């Protein structure tokens, strides 16, 4: 009790930091959906959303009103508790990774000693949301999407973890702030280029983004695992995808591109600019690449990404020993 009284100010400040960052990320994810639609329209030589507000600036408000007033329907043939739980897991799993990411040298909410392992754990947890959603919907298309997600996870989870082991070996720590500080003289993307490449590919798969959106491919599975969802439950899945994009982009920046480190301008501005670049890259990949066949995705993971990751790990170990 004495310890609680002495540290009440620190606890209160930390609590408000968590609330502020999480609300900022959720709002940014909602705005990102509009930004993506506008950018895709530019890439495809069309207008995009431009009717609500000036140049479509109020489209987000219109979308929120539409989702909030839609019928929140639960199919009578579904397993109701798991059906309701699935979008909550999808929304919170990668959102919980945000507090362990250092925004500057002085602004980090929770500086975990096992930050990398915590991210891998939460990335694995996000797959359960898809599995539960597909199974509890009692719909064949949803179940096929969930099965695709599970099998796809078996291929990318392996090289997702191994791609980070080279960074961990080079910095000598699982703590994300230590990894950023180890990049004062050279970013990890140069000695760990193969690790960065495979982590970027695995990050696309974690977010279920093009070209790894097999669990929800509209042309084949009619929206896949969330075919039975509507209203706010569908909104949680929708926003959860954009939260995962921001989370993975933040991790790429901190692990391979020096985080807040950079010349001339403040560190927080560097951090935000780097994140914006990778978010733009994710959108560009969606606009440019087609969706491959399901078996091609699995073969690509096992025959290209995994050997490349192992080669990067052995090369890193050799350079450290030499």
Swiss-Prot record:
Membrane topology annotation: Multi-pass membrane protein
Main location: membrane
InterPro entries on file: NADH_UbQ_OxRdtase_su1/FPO, NADH_UbQ_OxRdtase_su1_CS
Alphabetized PROSITE patterns for the sequence: COMPLEX1_ND1_1, COMPLEX1_ND1_2
Top-rank taxon, per record: Bacteria
Enzymatic reactions: a quinone + NADH + 5 H(+)(in) = a quinol + NAD(+) + 4 H(+)(out)
Class of enzymatic activity (EC top level): translocase
Keyword hit for Lipid biosynthesis: no
Keywords for the protein's UniProt record, in alphabetical order: Cell membrane, Membrane, NAD, Quinone, Translocase, Transmembrane, Transmembrane helix, Ubiquinone
Enzyme Commission number(s) of this protein: 7.1.1.-
Cell compartment(s), UniProt: Cell membrane
One cellular component (GO) term of this entry: plasma membrane
TM region positions: 15-35, 50-69, 81-101, 114-134, 149-169, 186-206, 237-257, 265-285, 302-322
Function per UniProt: NDH-1 shuttles electrons from NADH, via FMN and iron-sulfur (Fe-S) centers, to quinones in the respiratory chain. The immediate electron acceptor for the enzyme in this species is believed to be ubiquinone. Couples the redox reaction to proton translocation (for every two electrons transferred, four hydrogen ions are translocated across the cytoplasmic membrane), and thus conserves the redox energy in a proton gradient. This subunit may bind ubiquinone.
HAMAP family in the cross-refs: NDH1_NuoH
Subunit structure of this chain's protein: NDH-1 is composed of 13 different subunits. Subunits NuoA, H, J, K, L, M, N constitute the membrane sector of the complex.
Family the UniProt entry places it in: Belongs to the complex I subunit 1 family.
Name of the protein in question: NADH-quinone oxidoreductase subunit H
Protein's organism: Buchnera aphidicola subsp. Acyrthosiphon pisum (strain Tuc7)
């Amino acid at each position: 009790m004495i310890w609680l009284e002495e540290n009440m100010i620190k606890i209160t400040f930390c609590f408000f930091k968590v609330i502020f960052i999480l609300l900022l990320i959720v709002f940014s994810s909602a705005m990102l959906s509009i930004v993506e639609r506008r950018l895709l329209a530019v890439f495809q030589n069309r207008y995009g959303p431009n009717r609500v507000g000036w140049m479509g600036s109020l489209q987000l408000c219109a979308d929120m009103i539409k989702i909030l007033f839609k019928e929140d329907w639960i199919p009578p043939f579904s397993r109701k508790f798991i059906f309701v739980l699935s979008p909550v897991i999808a929304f919170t799993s990668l959102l919980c990774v945000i507090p362990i990411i250092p925004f500057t040298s002085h602004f980090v909410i929770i500086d975990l000693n096992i930050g990398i392992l915590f991210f891998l754990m939460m990335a694995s947890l996000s797959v359960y949301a898809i599995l539960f959603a597909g199974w509890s919907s009692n719909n064949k298309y949803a179940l096929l999407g969930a099965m695709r997600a599970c099998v796809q996870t078996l291929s990318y989870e392996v090289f997702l973890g191994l791609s980070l082991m080279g960074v961990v070996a080079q910095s000598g720590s699982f703590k994300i702030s230590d990894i950023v500080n180890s990049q004062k003289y050279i970013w990890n993307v140069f000695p760990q280029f193969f690790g960065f490449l495979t982590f970027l590919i695995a990050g696309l798969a974690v977010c279920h983004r093009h070209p790894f959106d097999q669990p929800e491919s509209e042309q084949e599975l009619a929206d896949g695992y969330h075919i039975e969802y509507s209203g706010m439950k569908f909104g949680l899945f929708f926003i959860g995808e954009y939260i995962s994009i921001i989370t993975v982009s933040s991790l790429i920046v901190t692990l391979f591109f020096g985080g807040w480190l950079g010349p001339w301008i403040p560190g927080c501005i560097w951090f935000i600019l780097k994140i914006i670049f990778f978010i733009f890259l994710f959108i560009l990949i969606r606009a440019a690449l087609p969706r491959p066949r399901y078996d091609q995705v699995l073969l690509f993971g096992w025959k290209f990404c995994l050997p490349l990751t192992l080669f990067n790990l052995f090369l890193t170990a050799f350079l450290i020993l030499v």
